[in-house]
UniProtKB/Swiss-Prot annotation:
InterPro entries to which the protein is assigned, alphabetical: GLABRA2/ANL2/PDF2/ATML1-like, HD, Homeobox_CS, Homeodomain-like_sf, START-like_dom_sf, START_lipid-bd_dom
Protein name in UniProt: Homeobox-leucine zipper protein HDG3
Keyword vocabulary terms for this entry: Coiled coil, DNA-binding, Homeobox, Nucleus, Transcription, Transcription regulation
Claim: Transcription regulation is one of the keywords in the record: yes
């Protein structure tokens, strides 16, 4: 009988409560209760004792009295069944119900009350024990299932190559060989299908293989050839979207890369140390190996590591920066001096709301230093964008060329990207991490120091370009234009200033496009030890360019002067006649200038000859500078069309331009707080040599262009002679 059926009752001297134990008292050898020194009202009874209790046997006057026990009454089976039936209907009886029940069962109302309390407690305990048991069983089941899945992941095999699918469980070389083996096996199967078809036609039996339908060819992508070849060195192989077996691995890589980027962008020393320029941070490779022991792929032998970090305030909101990074046309335009070509091959994940949160896409890009002497870098990677919190975004790249058998590039992007945090007044705090491995054993001549120290593609180069481009965009969107007045100036309306800024922006965009996307014959001339790249473009039905054959000639050279000195000299209109052959020795005058950046040297200018009667041409000049690179770009424009555009409301996109100019870089020898190094200049001319849609290039045109560029280089070198001790 459970304890809930036994209720303690205080003994008030009522002998009716002792009737059940009369037999027990008689079996005590006729012992008188008074001889035990106990009052009959204090006699204890045990309702559980059904035997002839011998506990009072031998009790004498000289023996200490026993301790009192609580007295229990055992309810009858009828009472218990009645109360349980009532309990099922009403577990919480009120006072009236308890009194009625006590009268019916011959029990005290207090006994009824205690019984129901005990019954509720008993049921509650039983329910809790049952729930705990169920939860314990479920927990054990989940643990077993988790362990089973872990073992399954660890032992899973790639259906394509037969190798392990877990990242980091095998070396890069082993994984690449397995994929190559799977590709060769697939080719054998496809050849066997072809052989079977031939066998049916000729009647000659061939050895049979499992028949496999050849896959549909994916959309092709062809890497453009960079200057003097490219670091990719894969003979223009094509790639397409990743197959279904590779996508889970790509997603796992992207998620792991995002976790690594968040650490790299927020942890300071000892992971990051002082960089080459005193502001950027350089990666401590030993600490990196300790922090990321498993790593996302092994370090490749013969590859050189470049890793840096930079932080800056940018005049753009986080969502604007994210949109610019996730759309390849905006990305390549924003970083036109770094990204030569870019393409999105496939979007694996996309946000339904269209705000790029969670977007994951496969991309390829060609990175460049604007010089015919420097090979380009090609990369095939996945880009992943994720919002990390309110006003906080992260965008990360990681190379995936090792997962695809038909790509063999020599530039791998380890987790690289940026952390974008929203600030006040439409600004964003951008922390940029650039981490690549490159096999660039080739010679760079005068660019060797800049390239090998990692400065050419460092994080501060990306951030500096981003800051400068956002300043330019803000100036175009603003209606409060800052202009400079001079003694020989023209008055421009806001529409005229906007048109002039748009023309300057077109000059910059066309200059970079001419350096990157020109196709056709490429000639390298070694006259006077200078390599000159001459490329041809054909202009047809382009309202912003003259129709015919356009030559783009470019070369690079070194000057023994700091970049700021060279930039300030070349941008000044009063110095232009010293180096510009087209000026014919005549002075140029600045008649308008509109600032498009915080630095007043970032501006668009309008220049013209001192004697306007001798020339009907003007020059629109775009000057731009940041701590890593400077540009002086310009284009001759017709005075009449320019006057219509600035004052008559003409469309600036229809002003015919052929940009030329200079890209100025540090030579990589300068020290922070110490001696400044020299400058590396790339000069590029775009010229119309044959007009008309059916025009063809002539040898004399190439010779004239080469002579023009050499003359300009010689004049500039004479203005900055080498200082000897």
């Amino acid at each position: 009988m459970s304890q809930s059926n036994m209720v303690p009752v205080a003994n008030n001297g009522d002998n009716n409560n002792d009737n059940e134990n009369n037999n027990n008292n008689n079996n005590n050898g006729g012992t008188d209760n008074t001889n035990a020194g106990n009052d009959s009202g204090d006699q204890d009874f045990d309702s559980g004792n059904t035997s002839s209790g011998n506990h009072g046997e031998g009790l004498g006057n000289n023996q200490a009295p026993r301790h009192k026990k609580k007295k229990y009454n055992r309810h009858t089976q009828l009472q218990i069944s009645e109360m349980e039936a009532f309990f099922r209907e009403c577990p919480h009886p009120d006072d009236k119900q308890r009194y009625d029940l006590s009268a019916q069962l011959g029990l005290d109302p207090v006994q009824i009350k205690f019984w129901f309390q005990n019954k509720r407690t008993q049921n509650k305990n039983q329910q809790e024990r049952f729930e705990n048991s169920e939860l314990r069983n479920l927990n054990n089941h989940l643990r077993s299932e988790n362990q089973r899945l872990r073992e399954a992941i660890h032992q899973a095999l790639c259906p394509k190559c037969g190798g392990q699918t877990a990242i980091g469980e095998m070396t890069f070389e082993e994984h690449h060989l397995r994929i190559l083996n799977a590709r060769l096996t697939e080719e054998i199967k496809q050849l066997s299908v072809t052989a079977e078809k031939i066998s049916r036609l000729t009647g000659i039996p061939v050895r049979s293989h499992p028949r496999v339908s050849p896959p549909n060819p994916p959309p092709n992508f062809e890497f453009g050839m960079g200057s003097k070849g490219n670091v990719g060195n894969h003979s223009r192989e094509t790639t397409g979207p990743a197959d279904a077996n590779t996508k889970p691995i790509i997603m796992e890589l992207a998620f792991g890369a995002m976790e690594e980027l968040l650490v790299m962008a927020q942890v300071a020393e000892p992971l990051w140390m002082g960089g080459f320029n005193g502001t950027s941070l350089a990666l401590n490779l030993d600490e990196y190996e300790k922090t990321f022991r498993t790593g996302l792929g092994p370090r490749l032998g013969g590859f050189r590591t470049e890793a840096s970090r930079e932080t800056a305030l940018v005049a753009m909101c986080p969502t604007g920066i994210v949109e610019m990074l996730m759309q390849e046309n905006l990305w390549s335009t924003m970083f036109a001096g770094i990204v030569g070509r870019a393409r999105t091959h496939e979007q694996i994940m996309a946000d339904a709301a269209g705000n790029f949160n969670g977007n994951l896409q496969i991309m390829s890009a060609e990175y460049q230093v604007l010089s015919p002497l420097v090979t380009t870098r090609e990369s095939y990677f996945v880009r992943y964008c994720k919002q990390q919190g309110e006003g906080l975004w992260a965008v990360v790249d990681i190379s995936i060329d090792h997962l695809l058998p038909n790509i063999n590039l020599k530039c791998r992007r380890r987790p690289s990207g940026c952390l974008i945090q929203e600030m006040h007044s439409g600004y964003s705090k951008v922390t940029w991490v650039e981490h690549v491995e490159v096999d660039d054993a080739g010679s760079y001549s005068i660019f060797e120091k800049l390239i090998c120290t990692g400065q050419a593609f460092a994080a501060n180069r990306w951030v500096g370009t981003l800051v400068r481009q956002c300043e330019r965009i803000s100036s175009i969107l603003s209606t409060d234009f800052q202009s400079v007045d001079s003694g020989d100036h023209i008055t421009l309306t806001n529409h005229g200033k906007m048109s002039m800024l748009k023309i300057a922006e077109r000059i910059a965009r066309t200059f970079f496009a001419g350096m990157t996307n020109a196709t056709g014959s490429t000639i390298f001339s070694g006259v006077e030890g200078e390599d000159i790249r001459v490329m041809t473009m054909k202009s047809v039905n382009d309202p912003g360019k003259p129709p015919g054959v356009i030559i783009c000639a470019a070369t690079s050279f070194w000057l023994p002067a700091p970049p700021n000195t060279v930039f300030d000299f070349l941008r000044e209109a009063t110095h232009r006649h010293n180096w510009d052959v087209l000026c014919n020795g005549e002075m140029m005058h600045k008649i308008a200038e509109i600032t498009n950046g915080i630095d007043k040297r970032n501006c668009a200018s309008l220049l013209r000859h001192g004697h306007t009667s001798k020339s009907k041409m003007m020059i629109v000049q775009e000057t731009s500078t940041d701590p890593t690179a400077s540009f002086v770009l310009y284009a001759p424009v017709d005075m009449t069309s320019m006057d219509i555009t600035l004052h008559g409301g003409g469309d600036p996109d229809f002003v015919v331009i052929l940009p030329s100019g200079f890209a100025i870089f540090p030579d990589g020898t300068g020290k922070p707080g110490g001696k400044e190094g020299g400058s590396l200049l790339t000069i590029s001319f775009q010229m119309l040599v044959e007009s008309g849609p059916e025009a063809r290039l002539s040898v004399s045109s190439v010779a004239t262009t080469e002579n023009l560029i050499r003359t300009t280089v010689r004049r500039i070198k004479d203005l900055f002679p080498c200082q000897t001790a």
